């Protein structure tokens, strides 16, 4: 899969301040009937996003006109908990999110984000509340900062994940960096 590198990214924000949003809330299991990574966006947050008649829920923040086109989700603690389905990351990416800022993430969900070219960022509640006041924010991955016009916040990220996202590398691309060594090994053994 081709991954678009993330270095400095400016995007529109949408707040969704709930804690413990699990993978079944992100993408209900009824929609897991395909293995392709695309096509899950319309089902992201399905039970919150739509009313029983199938129309958009006007009270769901991402449905509000002011948030249309948002690519940075600002949310609560323990985002992506629950089952380890990678479909949750696929749904959020297909919906249009490139960055998710939360208080914390499930470990498996965090990894699934990075494998699908989404940057998960952990910030405290005060920092997230500040960011949510702005329509757009800028994320500088090389310097590990999230900025508004008035303030910047530092975030931590493992160097391996950071390097993969900055250079647009997936697991296959990383493996192919060692192609000569692999071929040499195969010829030797």
From Swiss-Prot:
What EC number(s) would the UniProt record show? Answer: 4.2.1.33
Q: Could you tell me what this protein is called?
A: 3-isopropylmalate dehydratase small subunit
Q: Does the keyword Ribonucleoprotein apply?
A: no
Gene3D superfamilies of this UniProt entry? Aconitase, domain 4
Q: Which organism is it from?
A: Staphylococcus epidermidis (strain ATCC 35984 / DSM 28319 / BCRC 17069 / CCUG 31568 / BM 3577 / RP62A)
**Taxonomic classification, please?**
Bacteria, Bacillati, Bacillota, Bacilli, Bacillales
Into which family does the record put it? Belongs to the LeuD family. LeuD type 1 subfamily.
User: What is this protein's function?
Assistant: Catalyzes the isomerization between 2-isopropylmalate and 3-isopropylmalate, via the formation of 2-isopropylmaleate.
* InterPro entries to which the protein is assigned, alphabetical: 3-IsopropMal_deHydase_ssu (IPR004431), Aconitase/3IPM_dehydase_swvl (IPR015928), AconitaseA/IPMdHydase_ssu_swvl (IPR000573), IPMI_Swivel (IPR033940), LeuD (IPR050075)
Which enzyme class, named as a word?
Answer: lyase
